[in-house]
Structure formats: structure tokens, C-alpha cells
């Protein structure tokens, strides 16, 4: 249940929100999870590394399915990703 995963991840200190959360299986049958994680804008690199570790630990501790491949994109609160038009102009 991705809503349950999102709720757990959003309870990690310094995490403001989680969006674009996707879970799937690659052709080899390996489960994977990807998410954009909005974090407090004034975080240090050490704090960001700690958040990444806590995100991994959360998945391992709270969910029965082992997810060996995860990708978390950390975004500072207030970040606006460029639109497709901006990327291709």
C-alpha cells in the first residue's frame, strides 16, 4: 500500500512531504521503489545523508517485502522542477 509507505516516510525527521512515489518490478523480478522526498531547505549534507539512511531503514523495518533497489530524490522545500518546455528550449 503506497499510501502507508508515504505516511511512514513522511514521519522521518526533516522530511516535509513525499510525492511521485512509485513501486514496480523490473524485468528480472526485482522490486524497486522511487520517490521524490521534500526536505527542510536548510539541511546540511550530513543531515541529508542521514535522511537517506532513515528512508532505507524505514522501508526495511516496516514493510515485509524486501526492496533491494530504491531511488530517493531529495528536494529542498520550495524547489520547483523545470517544466518540459524549459528543459527542451
Predicted features along the sequence, with ranges:
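Peripheral (non-transmembrane) domains and long loops of multi-pass membrane proteins
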Residues: 1-89
Amino acid at each position: 500500500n503506497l499510501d502507508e509507505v508515504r505516511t511512514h516516510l513522511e514521519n522521518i525527521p526533516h522530511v516535509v512531504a513525499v510525492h511521485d512515489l512509485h513501486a514496480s518490478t523490473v524485468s528480472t523480478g526485482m522490486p524497486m521503489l522511487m520517490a521524490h522526498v521534500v526536505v527542510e531547505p536548510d539541511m546540511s549534507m550530513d543531515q541529508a545523508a542521514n535522511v537517506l539512511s532513515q528512508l532505507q531503514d524505514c522501508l526495511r523495518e516496516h514493510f515485509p517485502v524486501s526492496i533491494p533497489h530504491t531511488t530517493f530524490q531529495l528536494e529542498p522545500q520550495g524547489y520547483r522542477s523545470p517544466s518540459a518546455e524549459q528543459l527542451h528550449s
